[in-house]
Amino acid sequence: MQLDPASGWCQGVRVCRSPNFNARPSGEISLLVIHNISLPPAQFATGKVQEFFQNRLDVTEHPYFAGIADLRVSAHFLIERDGTVTQFVSCLERAWHAGVSSFEGRETCNDFSVGIELEGTDDLPFEDAQYQALTTLTRQLQSTFTAITAQRICGHSDIAPGRKTDPGPAFDWARYRAALAKAALEQEEQR
């Protein structure tokens, strides 16, 4: 996969455009937010996340859907259990993933962040393929948006404490950070 800095779209990933975005205010993209999602909860590979982000979810298909029927949300990316990456919104646009949020005293994280959803739940381990895809995608983002340092990668729970819990305790931050460090070192050695 390759992120095109001019368009904010990744080449080599699935594209499923969401209408749930708007223009970013001026300023640097400097934060990466990791989330998890599954629709219905704890059910995978249903295609319902894609429908949800496109406002096409049939709310009569599952009782859970009635509670989210009026939400208009998106993320820039979704990484499915098998590692498939789908992009919904250009990284240059503001996806609606963070909601009421704050990072280091700065409110409204959607203004300056990229959001990645991992297909999963707080309590089920994520798949090797997801960690691999997340690492590759993160390195692409860091190459384009250099202000997204390791210290500026967080979970939704970090920017919306008490309101959000994802990516949850099943997400292995140490594994992810070690993979990022290794990928960065390998990238430096190739230069």
Each language-model region and where it sits:
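Basic/polar, cationic surfaces and motifs that engage anionic cell-wall
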Residues: 1-9, 107, 112, 121-191
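Residues immediately flanking
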Residues: 36-37, 118, 157
